[in-house]
């Protein structure tokens, strides 16, 4: 029987200076049957993505902490009120990736708020600032991102989604590691029927790498022996030329939005692109 991701119920409480989101993941019988302990992936217990339903104009990438078994908590940054799609990525010790989904109504911010995690980020786009294949997308701080693909993208075929990050003189820049990778990408179909969190070609998620390492040692039963990789190992795949390539096979035709997150300096920047997949 096909595995069905568990449901997750979000709630938001507001006080004078915080909007606190709590997310409880349901402990279903099917989930327990395949369950292994949830472990950090790229140093985070969960990667939570919020996408506004009004044309996907607002995008947030947050990192809740686990306060109890399957209960997660995060403070929302200063992002506008409204209805949002919610996607929560979890990783288990046996290498399984799980995405929980829901929708949530975000109330207005109480005033000046700060992210609860320095790696949290959010971005707003519109018809002027979004990009398409072959276009240059202006970023903040004088940077820009070019989507290098120029040929049509066809569903059912693996495509390398290629991007280049440049400075104000259009020279490629070196990228600092963001969550152990030179970049991250999120792809969502306009009807929210498809969601994927991608990493660049040539990189591998730390959880998966630990599982492979355990198998190489013949350790396929005692999962408790798995240990995190040193931070230096996670940072070996750094983009020195500002170029990123994300291999992906779009499952069906339609319009998709792609957010690409990079860290050319001490700040996370997000490029937003749309594509019509044939």
Per-segment meaning from a language model:
Residues 83-87, 255-259:
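Short, conserved beta-strand segments of beta-strand-rich sandwich/propeller modules, principally
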Residues 62-68, 236-241:
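Short beta-strand segments within Ig-like beta-sandwich modules, predominantly Fibronectin type-III
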Residues 15-20, 82, 154-158, 254:
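Solvent-exposed, conformationally flexible loop/turn segments
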Residues 88-90, 165, 260-262:
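Conserved structural position at the C-terminal beta-strand
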Residues 1-15, 93-153, 175, 179-181, ...:
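Extracytoplasmic/periplasmic copper-protein system
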Residues 66, 73-80, 250-251:
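Residue-level recognition of secondary-structure-to-loop junctions
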Residues 18-33, 158-171:
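Beta-strand-rich structural segments
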Residues 35-46, 176-182:
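Short coil-to-beta strand junction motifs in C2/discoidin
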């Amino acid at each position: 029987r096909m595995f069905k991701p568990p449901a997750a119920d979000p709630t938001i409480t507001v006080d004078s200076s915080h909007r606190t989101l709590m997310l409880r993941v349901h402990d279903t019988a099917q989930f327990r049957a395949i369950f292994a302990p949830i472990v950090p992936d790229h140093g985070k217990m969960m990667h939570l993505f919020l996408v506004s339903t009004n044309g996907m104009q607002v995008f947030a990438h947050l990192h809740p902490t686990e306060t109890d078994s399957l209960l997660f908590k995060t403070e929302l940054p200063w992002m506008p009120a409204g209805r949002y799609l919610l996607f929560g990525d979890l990783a288990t010790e046996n290498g399984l990736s799980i995405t929980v989904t829901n929708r949530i109504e975000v109330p207005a911010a109480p005033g000046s708020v700060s992210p609860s995690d320095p790696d949290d980020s959010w971005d707003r786009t519109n018809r002027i600032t979004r990009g398409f294949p072959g276009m240059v997308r202006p970023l903040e701080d004088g940077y820009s991102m070019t989507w290098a693909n120029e040929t049509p993208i066809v569903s059912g075929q693996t495509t390398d989604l290629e991007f280049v990050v440049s400075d104000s003189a259009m020279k490629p820049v070196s990228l600092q590691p963001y969550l152990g990778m030179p970049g991250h990408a999120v792809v969502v179909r306009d009807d929210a029927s498809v969601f994927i969190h991608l990493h660049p070609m040539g990189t591998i998620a730390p959880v998966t790498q630990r599982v492979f390492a355990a198998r190489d040692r013949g350790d396929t039963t005692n999962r408790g022996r798995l240990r995190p990789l040193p931070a230096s190992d996670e940072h070996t795949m750094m983009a020195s030329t500002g170029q990123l390539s994300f291999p992906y096979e779009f499952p069906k035709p339609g319009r998709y939005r792609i957010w690409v997150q990079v860290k050319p300096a001490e700040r996370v920047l997000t490029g937003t692109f749309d594509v019509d997949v044939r």
